[in-house]
Amino acid sequence: RGESSGSSDRKKSEFVTMCESRVVTAHGIFNSNNTTQGEINMTAYTVRDAKIEDAQRILEIYAYYVENTAITFEYDVPSKEEFKQRMRMTMQKYPYLVIEKEGRVYGYAYAGPFKERAAYDWACELSIYVDHAAKKCGLGKQLYAALTERLKQMGITNLYACIGYPQTEDEYLDKNSEQFHEHLGFQTVGTFHRCGYKFNRWY
């Protein structure tokens, strides 16, 4: 596990990548002027707080990653009721956001505690999932920008995202997540090796 010495006068975000992964530190706020190839006009998309009523659609987005990728290390798609309970637990303290267009949710992101000890109260772990058919369209960047701003307002100074990173890309895991975070200014600060086993292989 990578560690950083967080301080309130130096805003920095860090993310931990698992499975040959890395913990990354981002300095400052994500630059909204950075654009990527294939980025779409975001004016039609809206970021808002998630509602429990969104659970079914959010679970549909997540289920693809559970069943087809090593992006999440979960083996089985949770039930709708279990997923609702996870959402409720997060919403008690942290922001849980969705991005939608014309009433349809295309992605979601949320924060949670990095560790349970009181001294970690200024640190959060981030999670983000975008409809697999709408990846690399700028939705993730817009979600992260909104989530980061909300967490800043809460006084959070350190952000972590634990992501899978393959030494060699395969059909279950590529390096897109690492590249996405690097594009937003994250930097590697730590690595776990062979810490997750899924699809009969180590990550």
Per-range role (PLM):
Residues 151-173:
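Conserved GNAT acetyl-CoA-binding A-motif
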Residues 127-136, 163-168:
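A short, internal acetyl-CoA/4′-phosphopantetheine-binding micro-motif in the GNAT/acyltransferase core
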Residues 162-164, 178, 182-201:
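Conserved catalytic-core motifs of GNAT/GCN5-like acyltransferases
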Residues 43-45, 103-108, 203:
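Glycine-rich phosphate/pyrophosphate-binding loop shared by adenosine-nucleotide-utilizing enzymes
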Residues 46-58:
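A short beta-loop-alpha structural element at the N-terminal edge
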Residues 75-133, 144, 150:
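Acetyl-CoA-dependent GNAT
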Residues 60-77, 90:
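Helix-loop element at the rim of GNAT/NAT acetyltransferase active sites that forms part
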